[in-house]
Amino acid sequence: MKIKWLCTAFIAVSTLNLYAQTGKITWDKTDYQGKPWVKNVSRPNEISEGLQNRHLSIWASHGRYYDSKKGTWKWQRPILFGTTEDLYTQTIVLPYLIPMLENAGAIVFTPRERDWQKNEVIVDNDSKYNGYKEESLKKKWENTSVPGFAQHYGSYSDGENPFIAGTARQVKSRKRKSKLSSVVYQPTIPESGRYAVYVSYQTQKKSVDDAEYIVFHKGQETHFHVNQRMGGGTWVYLGTFEFDKGNSINNSVVLTNRSTHKGIVTADAVRFGGGMGNIIRGTSVSGLPRFLEGARYYTQWAGAPRNVVSTSNGSNDYNDDINSRSLMTNWLAGGSSYLPHVKDGKMVPIELSLAVHSDAGVKSDGSLVGTLGICTTQQGNSTLGDGLSRQASKTLAQQLVANAKKDIEKSLNISWQTRSVWDRNYSETRLPAVPSAILETLSHQNFPDIKLGQDPNFKFTLARSIYKTILKYEADMHHTRYVVQPLAPNSFKIEYISAKKIRLQWKATSDVSEPTAIPTSYNVYTSIGNSGFDNGVNVRDSYYDIELEPGMVYNFKITACNRGGESFPTETLSAFQRNGAKQTILIINGFHRLSSPAVINNNLEQGFDIEADPGLSYINNAGWSGRQSNFDISMMGKEGVDALGYGGEELVGKVIAGNNFSYTREHAEALSHTGNYNIVSCSSKAVENGEIDLSKYTLVDLVLGNEKDDGHSLIYYKSFKPSLRQKLSAYLQKHGKLLVSGSYLASDMQGADEQLWLKNYLKVTYDGSNANNYNSTISGMGTSFDIYRTINEQHYGAYTPDNISPTDNAFCALTYADGHGAAVAYKGNDYSVFTTSFPLECIKSSSIRNNIMKGIITYLMSK
């Protein structure tokens, strides 16, 4: 009996010791119940079962760093297949993962610069620049008792902290809407484009949790509440917005002293754009945009203390960069409900960190290396945060790996490889004081991996899997319910329902891998003329009616919403109403392609041929280093010049334009100058599904862009799918008038029936590819003009477009610089058609584009 009692006692004590050593496995009652660090109060949809009020630290791996031993700036990983890990993982995290998390309501911090904008403008009270203006009414602005940000000209030395170099301002809050004190931050924007907006302030004892910031952007305004009780003395991200070039109150930020609480509102600098690296190491700065640098340099620019920025005291930037990602996370989270015992923190309730990496390793048999997870449970502090077991990190890593395989295979119908979960001593999983994981997404050294990994649809699917894992993990950690945000709607179309009123209509998209991702409402976003998109209106039905003001081009995009958040948007569609118009032109958007560069993959060679076809990223891409030069498969697994995949660095720092899904806007703008016509638009999918009666339209403008079946993309694209051909044929047979433009509309039609259709209906034949991409001139129609044909940052290019020749009674209307046909026109008693083998939206000059469009429409409409 005594032995049995002793055994029982031993087991009980052991269990207690185990629990004491490892801690609880969920947050239990530990939770943050206050207001979020940042909230967009202009968001039209409510999120109740997503990641609302969850604060996360997410980053892409590595970045450019200074090697003090060699006295040079360098990448942390080698150049392979047109990229390096330092560049590649950003292309998953920034355009896909972070927006998905934010669409679910999360507040995301990242210790590397997140804005692919090379310009930077700072407006601050300490600057002589006159973009800062205070107004004191009932309450007066005064200096805070603690230092603030100040900027000086030129670069910054190691250890220099800009957030203790100046002053900050404060004012007592006011509950009433009238007689508010305010600060206006009005920058001079050097170039029109998208700019991240960061604010800064100082946290005081009586700081309010709902400081009101208003961002004015291209004629729109978006309101934010910032919780100034946390996160003072660093850059706080509000969002990314379209700004016009120049200095205007329509492109500014306003901070007021309005609050629901009695307290203090503080003001410091506001930053527009990511900018260039400005931390000098050795004798120079990196010379690259800040978004390409490692976290070590961003954390310094963001005001982190020296023991966060550089644990080596400036002697080892490589180690500092790895450590600073986690240390800044801890610094921000210190003093919050999740890290209550950490002193001198910023009280931001960050509760999870994730490092997104890619890995090395090859498979000579052509198989995949796949995904690996990493956690640390045996090193570091025995527990995390408020007594949480390190096993919570292992659970996160395991779920990330398992779900990646499940979601990729189910969504893309491919086989995906996963490895395991390593429980090892890595800085990015040892140092964070909250649950953390490293996700090695794939092998950047193994071409079968990176061939899939550079497909934008793969990146979207992987990022969505990571987002869903974090969503479900957080629900488990807090014992709450979750709903997955929907996918973007499809079959978007606009039609007139009366003389001045149009109807926008769309369909929900199902998610085969997630039953909760069902939309319950939709956000309709509108842009009129040259203004930016508004903040949207939330509607319950899958349609929306709106009356148009005449003479203005309206642009629309739709997102799907539910309790879990908001989807990515649809393509942009456009509409235009002309007073007295009796005829309507329909624009069909048939350009949806997203792809990697051209693929070479045989027994002798592997790689991406960027010169032949650079592919199409979602909106844009800063992840390419340069053109691959070594395709020799026998050099697999090596590094340096002799390695398979080695290439140049001529594209480093370039944000290459991709498919922004808004080219109906450019066509509608050009068509609005052509005559007395109304204009509507639709997705090609709506036509293919029989949802559009083409016979209602006087003229159809089919936008194909760079659409084609490239043979390697994970999603099937085609310029003229059989269903679209059938609808266009029927339209033309009824005396229709058709304008078609696209780079590959002829080469994409190689089947005998396809070539016959081109000949019989478009009156064109394929005459090879026009390979002289560096001569962009096109001539004809009484003029000559240039088009985008090469990799650039302004607009996707018509890379190696088709030469086309006329058949029957058609004629060549435009030619490339070498004399080959670039456009074919046909007017018969049966129908009229005008075909260009380059996208009209690629014409560089908008005024020339308008004139060319007017000439084409005049030709097609004339009798």
What residue spans do the PLM features occupy?
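Aromatic-Pro/Gly-enriched surface loop or interdomain linker
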Residues: F81, Y96-A104, R112, G282, ...
